[in-house]
């Protein structure tokens, strides 16, 4: 049985306040996009895991697919499985690829083994793996608050817009992203901004992390500028980076123009 875990982008990100536990409260919009890994499981006489595609520099036991399987094993009887992950979503990009793999693993094993686990329980299990992991269980647009772990569904469709996603060969650490951000409640909530036409987002929707990341990694800012120069209605860094996306009314041709040739590049229409 096979499934295709998809990435997400952050539409805006406001760092609202610092918490007593040292973490930060944020607000952002998670929106699913059709940039996908492939995850397959088959019955086997022993559990084994293999991975191809984009290399991930992490030991197997720390892979979130394995963490998802182990989380299920503490609650249910799971037979031995042969697992293969084809990695196509860039990691360290603010796209939630690892969390998507884990959430889709929970759903895949649930279906494969006929466990009939309710989505609410799958979300609860996913929450033990990562803050944004539960989002991928239902995989629909949400207004995320708290540490990015509290979700409220939003009525938002970007169907028929064109997406260009660019990820340079740059890594951004979370402490680095927060380093120059002063937490503050936004004047206008993202829930209000997304009700406006996309063409009005540029002047109203911000990602607070850009003010920390851009001075340290100017290549990321240049990508955003290039997307706007290419006709983007809205462009922004996703999460803490380092990927940048642009939303367009028409198909983009950055690959044909040999722009971003040293970056991961995905262009396509949203559905």
From Swiss-Prot:
Enzyme Commission no: 2.7.1.148
SUPFAM superfamilies cross-referenced by the UniProt entry: GHMP Kinase, C-terminal domain (SSF55060), Ribosomal protein S5 domain 2-like (SSF54211)
Reaction catalyzed: 4-CDP-2-C-methyl-D-erythritol + ATP = 4-CDP-2-C-methyl-D-erythritol 2-phosphate + ADP + H(+)
Keyword Transferase: yes
Keywords: ATP-binding, Isoprene biosynthesis, Kinase, Nucleotide-binding, Transferase
Active site as annotated: 8, 132
Pathway, per record: Isoprenoid biosynthesis; isopentenyl diphosphate biosynthesis via DXP pathway; isopentenyl diphosphate from 1-deoxy-D-xylulose 5-phosphate: step 3/6
Gene Ontology MF annotations: 4-(cytidine 5'-diphospho)-2-C-methyl-D-erythritol kinase activity; ATP binding
InterPro entries per the UniProt record, alphabetical: GHMP_kinase_C_dom, GHMP_kinase_C_sf, GHMP_kinase_N_dom, IspE, Ribosomal_Su5_D2-typ_SF, Ribsml_uS5_D2-typ_fold_subgr
Protein name: 4-diphosphocytidyl-2-C-methyl-D-erythritol kinase
Gene behind this protein: ispE
